[in-house]
Amino acid sequence: MSEVILQLQKRLGETQLDVDLRLPAVGICAIFGRSGAGKTSLINLISGLTTPDVGEIHLAGRTLFSSSQGIQLPIEQRKIGYVFQDARLFPHYTVRGNLNYGVTDADPEYFASVTRLLALEPLLVRYPRDLSGGEKQRVAIGRALLSKPDLLLMDEPLASLDMPRKKEVMPFLENLAQHFRLPILYVSHSMQEILRLADHLVVLEQGKVLSAGPIEQVWSSKAMRPWQSFSEQSTLFSATVAKHHQTYGLTQVRLAEDVWLWVQQVEADVGSSVRMQVRANDVSIALDKPTASSIRNILPARIVAIEHQQPSKKSVSLKLELAPHCYLWAVVTEWAHAELALEVGMPVFAQIKGVSVAQRDVILTN
């Protein structure tokens, strides 16, 4: 499948939405930003609910909109599924009726695949009034998938659900993109949802793209600083489970070539891919490698950037290079920064307790 190509502009009151993006053809791309940043407006332009002032929209090798060529495909020809914040089910139809609404080419095998993935089979004869919020959203997702879209748009689909219902729906969302091999644009203001679900991240601010790319890259960028206080700053890694230490309940993961980390035991097979979060506050710095220490992870690194927090906080953020294109953030006090005379380019050792990275910080991605 081809990339999703978005080059468009739209005046939104006092805000000018101006986007130039190439998004992956498979996986979940989160659209993140403050209220009013243009997140929902962007996906409404893609869907055809609203029209760009100027620009291009290309999906799966097709042109959906082109102001220069005079192309504007109607909504029903765009092959896009849309899941709203509220499920928008028809109350007088059963779940089966809602799922089949608008389906013009019945495919029993595909219907069975969708209902099985979303665990909808026991609900097919029920009506929306008899469903929980999480069940309604699963039906809405199923209805969108049954249109066999080239792209799935999701506008804060979990925002109206309480935490137990969010936990109910989240595993289904994790499986969607890979199972159906399609791109999903997922609007959210929840950092927890993004951490768990997103492969790719776009940060919008007042209609402009501040940062876009793989989530591990964008998560550590300056674009995310307004949402991450120094106490919450962290690094995301795509890692591979290397081995388990059954005696001590630890798992070793591979972050990069010759970069390994011991963490609390991960319930995953050796060779599994995981996404792992390491909090900057859990990383300490030493100038010399300790010879006797309880800390299980002592990694050679090089300081590549230093950021000072506002003076009242007396903290310093250090960007450490562990290997080419493999970086780790650490937060130290101004006192430690001064006493160790830390400078960009200096070789150091990053220390991370094995118990500081727990099961909640590791997400299985395959």
Curated annotation (Swiss-Prot):
Enzyme Commission code: 7.3.2.5
Location in or out of the cell: Cell inner membrane
Domain ABC transporter: from-to ranges: 1-231
GO molecular function: ABC-type molybdate transporter activity; ATP binding; ATP hydrolysis activity
PROSITE patterns for the chain: ABC_TRANSPORTER_1, ABC_TRANSPORTER_2, MODC, MOP
Annotated GO CC locations: plasma membrane
Annotated ATP binding sites: 33-40
Gene3D superfamilies xrefs: 2.40.50.100, P-loop containing nucleotide triphosphate hydrolases
This protein's UniProt keywords: ATP-binding, Cell inner membrane, Cell membrane, Membrane, Molybdenum, Nucleotide-binding, Translocase, Transport
Pfam family, one: TOBE
Catalysed transformations (reactions): molybdate(out) + ATP + H2O = molybdate(in) + ADP + phosphate + H(+)
Membrane topology reported for the UniProt record: Peripheral membrane protein
Principal cellular location given in the protein's record: membrane
Sequence ranges assigned to domain Mop in this UniProt record: 292-361
Function, in words: Part of the ABC transporter complex ModABC involved in molybdenum import. Responsible for energy coupling to the transport system.
SUBUNIT field: The complex is composed of two ATP-binding proteins (ModC), two transmembrane proteins (ModB) and a solute-binding protein (ModA).
UniProt record similarity statement: Belongs to the ABC transporter superfamily. Molybdate importer (TC 3.A.1.8) family.
Record protein name field: Molybdenum import ATP-binding protein ModC
Highest classification ranks of the organism: Bacteria, Pseudomonadati, Pseudomonadota, Gammaproteobacteria, Vibrionales
Name of the encoding gene: modC
